[in-house]
């Protein structure tokens, strides 16, 4: 069995504090995605959590990003910010109707970030998972669920995810539990404890640890590792430092 691909990236690309730090001075804002998609191998799009994006935007992003690059897409808040996830069928259909299948092979996983108050309810979560499409426009979809309540650290939840090849997102966070489970043929991690006092966001020991973990994930399939929160200004440097350690 061949090893999987490790993709490392950041959340979004339009972040003013990155200008002059990650992006060169006076770099055109219109070309920030072009720059970021060549420095990283994946980007997590957060704007889709708040609303649909225009078909023209998806087409443009597909054209700008290089071959081999992938976008992870955050599922709409209207799908996940509710007490009964089983009732989100219409919102899920609306989310998948915005046209991002035009990304083709540049379409990465769909991230479903549950509300921090959402507790594990087997019937509700099973019904929600049943609503998630397996394909879109001929593309096989990958789904990743980010549970942010400790009640999801439950074999019953892992079993539901494993049955649909859904990854359980690993959070490195001061606020949310780190729930790790082998439930899919890919891994998804969101690293959220970067410090502004450390130029690379995380210190050497932490980055070495993440690199070792990524090497283990690679043995079973692809992995997606995003530097997301904490001192976001350090996210690109953290991602590049991890890429350098892994040679990817």
Question: Which residues are covered by each model-predicted region?
Answer:
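Residues lining hydrophobic/aromatic ligand-binding pockets adjacent to catalytic sites
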Residues: 1-248
């Amino acid at each position: 069995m061949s090893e999987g691909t490790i993709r490392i990236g950041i959340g979004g690309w339009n972040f003013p504090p990155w200008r002059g730090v990650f992006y060169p001075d006076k770099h055109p804002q219109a070309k920030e995605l072009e720059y970021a998609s060549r420095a990283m191998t994946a980007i997590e799009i957060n704007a889709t959590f708040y609303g649909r994006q225009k078909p023209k935007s998806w087409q443009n992003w597909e054209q700008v990003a290089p071959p081999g690059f992938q976008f992870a897409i955050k599922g709409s808040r209207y799908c996940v910010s509710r007490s009964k996830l089983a009732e989100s069928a219409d919102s899920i259909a609306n989310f998948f109707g915005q046209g991002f299948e035009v990304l083709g092979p540049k379409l990465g996983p769909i991230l479903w970030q549950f509300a921090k108050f959402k507790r594990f309810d087997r019937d509700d979560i099973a019904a929600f998972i049943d609503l998630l499409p397996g394909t879109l426009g001929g593309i096989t979809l990958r789904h990743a669920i980010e549970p942010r309540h400790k009640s999801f650290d439950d074999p019953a939840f892992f079993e539901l995810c494993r049955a649909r090849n859904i990854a359980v997102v690993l959070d490195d966070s001061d606020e949310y539990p780190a729930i790790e489970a082998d439930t899919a043929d890919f891994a998804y991690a969101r690293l959220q404890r970067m410090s502004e006092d450390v130029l690379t966001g995380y210190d050497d020991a932490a980055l070495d640890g993440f690199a070792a973990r990524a090497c283990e994930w690679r043995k079973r399939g692809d992995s997606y590792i995003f530097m997301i929160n904490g001192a976001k200004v350090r996210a690109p440097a953290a991602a590049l430092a991890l890429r350098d350690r892994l040679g990817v």
